[in-house]
Amino acid sequence: MARLTRRTFAIEPDVSEKMDALVDGHTLEANLLINKALRHYLEWGRFVENFKLVVSDPRLMKLLWSHLTVEEAREMGLQNGNSAVVEFILYYFRKFDLESVLKTFRVIGAEYSNAFAYSESGDDRNRTIILRHSMGQSASAYYGASLKALSVRLGMEVELEETDDQLVCKIRRVDKEQAIAPKTPKAK
């Protein structure tokens, strides 16, 4: 079991009552709940407002993607991958490298947004990323264009396989990976 750090803090009475009802008096469950809520805020919630991120029902997203052509979705993904996602990654991780790009897709796209199921395999030179989503070809085109734009910016070769229900992205290092530092100095 992981070593825990003890902290003492006060919570509002209505939050305490809801938490007690949810965990039914089990201390361990209360600790897990609090850790999960804090982790969710630290890894996701505090960035939602700054970048105007939202979590949407996958059925709604499937409907949205069905109203875009594959080329329109690909263009949106390319624009997003060349601007907003780079800014988000630099803000969130304070660096822009392959690991931060993949972690963004894994944590933000899969774990918190539930936009797709993420799987990854490979080594330092070659990676295969699979995003399973069941939202149509346009969703694959969007995610593929975004991931490709980010990877190419890092000096990597990318091969995409897009289907109606998933994107397979094969990334290969060409030479030395390029990394981009944030524009603003890190706060001390």
What is each of the regions a protein language model found here?
Residues 12-15, 45, 49-62, 70-75:
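Charge-rich, low-complexity segments
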Residues 58-129:
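An N-terminal amphipathic alpha-helical segment
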Residues 109-165:
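Short, hydrophobic/π-rich interface segment
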Residues 158-188:
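Short terminal or interdomain "cap/linker" segment that borders an active site or interface and mediates
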